[in-house]
């Protein structure tokens, strides 16, 4: 890039049309007017421009309750710093940015502030927010509307294919754009002046990167997976098809794509930062692996030695691929469930097993684990749960998507009857395989059980991240006057 002096890696050779349109339309160094001074109330001003004049806000005794009841969102210090880092980069001529922020630290709220900043100050007319899962489309639109609806319109592209261009923020799965090359057939390179990729290193595969590079303008990547997460792994010993090697290459490619070849993102806020600042909870790990499962998942596998009926020595090696088929016996599954129930954290106000997620190897395995847990619940808590103690939430179960919403809202199969003044879900455990990972927001989860091997670092971080958010359980009291009783 001889004009801006800020070269970037591209996924394919650009067409003449793209280059000409970029020259005419996208000029990050154009003369700018007065730029907003971004403060921590940048989003709150969109939600309620005159909030400072409200008597309930002026009165310090009622201010917190006023902000909470009106759901006013103020940027935390690190979120504010992330926005300012982007602003600094723009002033220096940077066009690509990468935010590395731990799960639960508010990447979407930070993105909302960044989107507002771009739309107000830097000639950006429309923003494309790319996700890689259907449920994240709806969630992103909901979160953007909660804080920006007074200023900007947010739509999901596949629901507004005819009038999407009336909106300032368009949310879509990258798969929708890839299908039949829709991104080329329907859109011009200049239709989006800012493209944001959520969980960038996972969503920007080879094909999806073409979508990302097709549009001219600013580019922002979001990720919760730090690049150095695999630094302790012997890279030389990994095969090309090893999930860790594939993920390592994706991470490196992602940092390069966003101009971070040094390995340093535009802004970083880790899990440890969040714990230190009091925003996140560091998980307590209970390791329930046996010697056999540890060997089974090792590079060499588990070597089984015995003798047959004729007295001949038998030696057989079992590896990762045998984990489910040959080692998930009834006895093993029961041991898993017993260990979980013995160590699971309890709800602070009902004493029940805290709300939990269990990740299984397959849908068949999830069915079995659910069945065993409900059998134990019947023994331990007769007539309390009616087989609703644990529920299978997988793609094969009708209404599973709604189940995830009900569980987060504490309404799955009704309410717990343990405390009439306190609201929590009757169902205590959701048993799943791949659902309820990325982007699933359920702050009162107390236990995450991984009853399967997990080879992808980003999957592990996302699963673990479901349980790192802080929760004030007092907020779930229907009648808070009963709290001290």
Where on the chain are the PLM-derived regions?
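Conserved C-terminal RecA-like helicase domain
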Residues: 168, 316-432
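ATP-dependent helicase/translocase motor core
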Residues: 1-126, 135, 139-150, 165-169, ...
